[in-house]
Every structure is written in C-alpha cells, then in structure tokens.
C-alpha cells in the first residue's frame, strides 16, 4: 500500500449511499388554478412543509411539460432526480379546484389546510407560473453568498429587465420580506434549483420572456462559489497549443504538490458533467475538496495573478498570513506581463518607430488596467467597510433605543404611586420614570435632539414631546391665569427630586462622550413616538388615568386628558390598581374612571419656572392666553371626523358627555395600534408644537 495514499483517504466515497425522498405531485383537471394557488400560498408566507418540493415540481412540470406526466417521466430531469433518490408520488383528484382539496387528509396537514382556507385566489393565468419561476431564478447568482447579496442582485436584475421592457413583477413581490421567503425556499429546495439550472442550460426552443430571464440568470450562476476553480484554470493551468503549461510562479516543489491535489479534486468535480459549474449552488459531492483553505499558497498566487490581469472578481480576501504572498504574486505577474509584451513587440515590430509606439501603448494599457483594477477593488473594500459600520451602528442604536424605552416603560408600569394633584410646569412625580444618564445609551443627546428625548419623557404629559429639553421649557414664558385660587405648596422632597433630575439631564446634555455622536442622525428625523402619543381630543382617549394599566398586546397606550377632581383622596389609602385592561378596571359607568382629577400633565396647565414654589389651579373660566398669532379657542377635527373646541373642552371641571360615551364604547371595543395612529388630529408637528408653546 502506498503510504502517501493515507493523505487522500476519506476524500472519496467508498460505499456511496443515496437517501430516498418522496415527492408528492398533484394532478387535476384544473392544473393552472392549483398552480396559482400554490404560488399564492408561497407568497403569503404559508409553510407548506414536506409538500413544498412537490408543489414547486408541480409548477415546473406545468410550465415546461404542460402537465404531461408521461413526457416528464421520460425526461432527463426525472431520470437524474430518481438517481438522486427522489420518488414521485402522484395524487390524482380530477374534480379538485382548490389546492387544499388535493392535500392528503392526515393530521399533520391540518394546520396547513386551516391556513389555506383563509387564502383567496382569483388568479388563473398560466403565464403567472413562468413569472414566478423566472423571479425565483433571479436569486441563483448570489445564492451561496447570502440573503442580502442575493436580494440586492435580484433587485438589480429586476431593474434591468423592467428598463428593457422584458417583464414587470408585482410590487409586493419586491418587498424585502417576500424576497427573503423566496431566498429561503430556493436555498432549501434542491429540485427547484436543479430544474431551473437544467432548463436554463438545455432549453433551446420555445423560449418566452420568462425562459430567457431564467437562462440569463443561470448563465450568471456558472462557477458561483467556485472562484478558485475559475482562476486556477484560467491563469495557473494555462492552456497552450502544445498542451497545459504551469504558470512560472507555481513551478516550485511545494506549490506543485498543491497543484497535483487540486487537479485530483477537479477530476472528481468533472464527474458531474454539465452540472459541475453549479456544484456549489446544488451542493454536489466533492465540492468540499475545493476550498481555498486546502490550497493556501496556490489560492493566494492564483488570486494575485488574476488581479494583475484585471479580474475584479478576484477581490476576495485570503488568509492574513498569505496576503503578502498574494501581493508578491500580483507584482511579479505585472513584471512578467511587461517582459512578455516587450518580447512580442521585438518580434512583430518592423522598425524602431513602430516598436516605440507599441511599447508606449502596451505600457499605458498595463498601467490603466492596473489602476482600474485597484480602484474597483478599493471601492469594494470601502463599500464592505461602510456596510459593516452601518450594520454595527444600527445594532447599537436599536439596542440603546430599546433599552431606554424599556427602562421607561418598565418603571412606568411598576411604579404604583398615584398621580400628585399639583399643577406644575413639568413636575416629575415619578422619579423612576426618568433614569439617570448612562454611558453608551441613548440618553446622551443634544439640546435640539427632541426625537431621542421623546423616548424617556414624562409619560403623563401629552405635550412633553413638544418641549426639546428643560432649558427650552424654562425659557418659554407663559402668562399666568387671571383668576387664581390659593396656590398649593410643593413638597420639599418633590422639589429636590426635580432639581436632581434636571441637573442630571443637563449633565447628560453637556457630556462629550463619543457614544453620543452615533445618535446624532436622530436630529433630522421626526419624533420617534409622534404617531403613538395621545391626540388632543377629549372624546377619543383610549386609556385610563392609572399608571399601571397596559395593553395585553404590549402597546403602550397614552393617557387621556385629566380633569379637576372635586373629592381629593388620600393616595396612601387608595393606591392605583394595576390592570391588564387597556382602560383599567372600569367596572360600570359610574366608576372612578369618569371622575376627573387635576394633574400636572393637563395640557392646559400654565408653564412656569420649576424653581418657584407656587402652582396654579385651573378654573372653568381660565381664558387668559398670551398668543397674538391665533384666535382661541379653535375647532380641531380629527382624522376620524370628531370635532372639539381646543382648549375649552380640556378645561371643563367634568368630562363632556361625548367623552363618557367614547370611553364606554372603546372599553367594550378596544382599538389597535393602527387605529390609534389614524386618530391624530389633522395638524402638523410644527402646529402641535406651536399650540403647546402658546397655551
């Protein structure tokens, strides 16, 4: 036994085994309708499970063989699939018009049947099958790279085909979610990949627009994931008139051994015949013997030589320890090119003048090719670096923003303290609702950054979004009410808490920590929670006054406007009750939910410096506003058509009848988050901000 054969043991199968797989084909008299319903089910994201391969093969048989089972059974496709271990099981149901009628009545298919019952299909066009198959083929060229690269490539191809007027795909097919579904199906379905590749190569007549797209995509898929094979065959194993010659750079003994092993791996790959260029996409046997890491020096030299010849496809990364070898091979190949060109010019030039012209041309050509190649490679590296940085920034921003939101919502939900009945400009009655600034969190913001500050504002203040920070709030001077009752003194602990929070927030604003800079792009965006805050109406509020109430679906509902409460209750004896109901434990109509209370979060509370010890209490005749630009009150119309007087309707000592009706109605019929967004008043953000600053 040759001892050196030990090195190759285990690289070739000695007892080849093929796993048997059953594929269900569907045969009806309404095959086009069934195929369209299969496409609709896939587009809807329904998981067909083990029926997926059969459904896709049914589409292919309908498109290429017009559902002629005899033609398909005698085709090379069926023979290859049988050799690969696939067994075809045909389900015949001539009268079936819906896909769910041909599914076997077995228990594990019951969820699929239930999902298909809700699916409505009105399409019955045969051309839609080819449209779907051609759309799937767009993902083949970059399938082995990853979903992002594959989707980007598919979108570029879609743009090209639309500009050429070949075919136009439905818009909802081009969404990222749908394209990820198709990518996942193509990645896992061997049958679909194989049939598309086989027909893309072998279909020579009867082409329509969809078949030409499939052939074009298959042509771009050749040697996908087999860059080392392509570069070595083109630049290292050079084909000449006298045979195959090794490149001078790989004639050393150590690299020669790698070349011999590579030739053996190539001979194994060549057994797959016409499918060998697609071995990586189809995951054929022997493909694992062609990795770059198995031939490190040969791979580095081949990529360096390919780059010297202007191949930008060779801009992949090699191992760090072989990067210098690659660059050395690149420089050596450039010098060898110049030498060969010089020798050729000496042989073909008839005089010195022609020789000089040819030498100058070839020198310029080599330099131009070299510079262009390096420019393209540097652009690719910059693009990769930008993408990596963008992904990291997005991850960091999402984590920081979600953490800050979670801190606010959790502290807001877990704090059982009832609302203090004092009217203050921005009195902070829950110290836990504002976490102190933490490094590497979104709390590091600038004073103008109203969008990021909206993630941790006082959740009881509907106008808290519209104030950029404490400084803006303190600088906005408001006229006091003409009719004042005796002011209530603010407790000392509350004052200290406010001063502490304000100082902490100012320290966070003045921080120069670099983590703060990565969130500066929030400045140019509208407020993140703008569409989630409460609207200014009094007759369409969706939550109660209790800080512990929360929606079952996890939607943070905004609080309603708060009214004057005639009976003051002791907060210690009557703590707020936490409830999972979006409107709290409303009980009956005569419950506490409809008894208004006064709160600092009332949007009509006059704003003043928080350092003053006074507080104002609203009265029904509170009508003094310092505003010369608009006439108050004004009528506001919401998108649902509700009208109300602003701010008069917010200043009543008892809620209007419309609010009582709306609360009872919406308690019985809870609204969704989308309906909440649709119930905003028809006012722009600047108008809302102007309203808030001029109350």
Swiss-Prot record:
One of the record's GO molecular function terms: RNA binding
Keyword field: Capsid protein, Coiled coil, Helical capsid protein, Host cytoplasm, Host-virus interaction, Phosphoprotein, Ribonucleoprotein, RNA-binding, Viral budding, Viral budding via the host ESCRT complexes, Viral nucleoprotein, Viral release from host cell, Virion
Motif segment (PTAP/PSAP motif): 603-606
One protein family per Pfam: Ebola_NP
GO terms classed as biological process: viral budding via host ESCRT complex; viral RNA genome packaging
GO CC terms of this entry: helical viral capsid; host cell cytoplasm; ribonucleoprotein complex; viral nucleocapsid
Localization, UniProt: Virion; Host cytoplasm
Comp. bias regions, Polar residues: 474-484
Biased composition (Acidic residues): 529-547
Keyword Ribonucleoprotein in record: yes
PTM comment, free text: Phosphorylated.
Bias (Basic and acidic residues) ranges: 502-516
Coiled-coil region list: 316-341, 372-400
Region (Disordered): 426-458, 472-611
Domain of life: Viruses
Domain notes: This protein can be divided into a hydrophobic N-terminal half, and a hydrophilic and highly acidic C-terminal half. The coiled coil region is critical for homooligomerization, for the interaction with VP35 and for NP function in RNA synthesis.
Function: Encapsidates the genome, protecting it from nucleases. The encapsidated genomic RNA is termed the nucleocapsid and serves as template for transcription and replication. During replication, encapsidation by NP is coupled to RNA synthesis and all replicative products are resistant to nucleases.
Family: Belongs to the filoviruses nucleoprotein family.
UniProt subunit comment: Homooligomer. Homomultimerizes to form the nucleocapsid. Binds to viral genomic RNA. Interacts with VP35 and VP30 to form the nucleocapsid. Also interacts with VP24 and VP40.
Name by which UniProt lists this protein: Nucleoprotein
Originating gene: NP
């Amino acid at each position: 036994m040759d001892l050196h054969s030990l090195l190759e043991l285990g690289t070739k199968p000695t007892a080849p085994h093929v796993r048997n797989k059953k594929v269900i084909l569907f045969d009806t008299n309404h095959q086009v309708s069934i195929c369209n319903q299969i496409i609709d089910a896939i587009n809807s994201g329904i998981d067909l499970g083990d029926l997926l391969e059969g459904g896709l093969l049914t589409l292919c048989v309908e498109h290429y063989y017009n559902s002629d089972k005899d033609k398909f059974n005698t085709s090379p496709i069926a023979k290859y699939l049988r050799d690969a271990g696939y067994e075809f099981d045909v389900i015949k149901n001539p009268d079936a018009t819906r896909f769910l009628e041909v599914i076997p009545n077995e228990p594990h298919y019951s969820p699929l049947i239930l999902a298909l019952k809700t699916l409505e299909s009105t399409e019955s066009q045969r051309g839609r099958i080819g449209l779907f198959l051609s759309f799937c083929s767009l993902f083949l060229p970059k399938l082995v790279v990853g979903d992002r690269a594959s989707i980007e490539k598919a979108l570029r191809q879609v743009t090209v085909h639309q500009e050429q007027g070949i075919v136009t795909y439905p818009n909802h097919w081009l969404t990222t979610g749908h394209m990820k579904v198709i990518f996942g199906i193509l990645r896992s379905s061997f049958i679909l990949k194989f049939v598309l590749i086989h027909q893309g190569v072998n279909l020579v007549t009867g082409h329509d627009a969809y078949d030409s797209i499939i052939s074009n995509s298959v042509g771009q898929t050749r040697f996908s994931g087999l860059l080392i094979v392509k570069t070595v065959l083109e630049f290292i194993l050079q084909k000449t008139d006298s045979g195959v010659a090794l490149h001078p750079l790989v004639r050393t003994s150590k690299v020669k051994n790698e070349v011999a092993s590579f030739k053996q791996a190539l001979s194994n790959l060549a057994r797959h015949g016409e499918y060998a260029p697609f071995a990586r996409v189809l995951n054929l046997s022997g493909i694992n013997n062609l990795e770059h890491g198995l031939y490190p020096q040969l791979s580095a030299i081949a990529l360096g030589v390919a780059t010297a010849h202007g191949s930008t496809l060779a801009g992949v990364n090699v191992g760090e320890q072989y990067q210098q070898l690659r660059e050395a091979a690149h420089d050596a190949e450039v010098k060898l090119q110049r030498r060969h060109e010089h020798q050729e010019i000496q042989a073909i030039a008839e005089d010195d003048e022609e020789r000089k012209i040819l030498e100058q041309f070839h020198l310029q050509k080599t330099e131009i090719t070299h510079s262009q190649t390096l420019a393209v490679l540097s652009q690719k590296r910059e693009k990769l670096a930008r993408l990596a940085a963008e992904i990291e920034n997005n991850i960091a921003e999402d984590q920081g923003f979600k953490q800050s939101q979670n801190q606010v919502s959790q502290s807001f939900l877990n704090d059982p303290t009832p609302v203090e009945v004092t009217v203050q400009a921005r009195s902070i009655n829950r110290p836990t609702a504002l976490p102190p600034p933490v490094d590497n969190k979104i709390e590091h913001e600038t004073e103008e950054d109203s969008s990021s500050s909206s993630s941790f504002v006082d959740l009881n203040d509907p106008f808290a979004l519209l104030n950029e920070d404490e400084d803006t709030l303190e600088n906005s001077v408001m006229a006091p009410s003409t009719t004042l009752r005796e002011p209530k003194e603010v407790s000392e602990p509350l004052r200290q808490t406010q001063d502490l929070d304000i100082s902490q927030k100012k320290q966070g604003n003045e921080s120069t920590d670099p983590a703060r800079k990565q969130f500066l792009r929030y400045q140019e965006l509208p407020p993140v929670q703008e569409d989630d805050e409460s609207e200014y109406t009094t007759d369409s509020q969706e939550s109660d006054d209790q800080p512990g109430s929360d929606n079952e679906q996890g939607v943070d509902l905004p609080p309603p406007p708060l009214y004057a409460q005639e009976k003051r209750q002791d907060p210690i004896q009557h703590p707020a009750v936490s409830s999972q109901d979006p409107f709290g434990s409303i009980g009956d109509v005569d419950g506490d939910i409809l008894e208004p209370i006064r709160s600092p979060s009332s949007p009509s509370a006059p704003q003043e410096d928080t350092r003053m010890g006074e507080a104002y209490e609203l009265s029904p005749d509170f009508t003094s506003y310092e505003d010369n630009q608009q006439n108050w009150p004004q009528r506001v119309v919401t998108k649902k058509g509700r009208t109300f007087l602003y701010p008069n309707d917010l200043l009543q000592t008892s809620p209007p009848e419309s609010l009582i009706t709306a609360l009872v109605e919406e308690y019985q019929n809870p609204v969704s988050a989308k309906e909440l967004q649709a119930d905003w008043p028809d006012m722009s953000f600047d108008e809302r901000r102007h309203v808030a600053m001029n109350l």
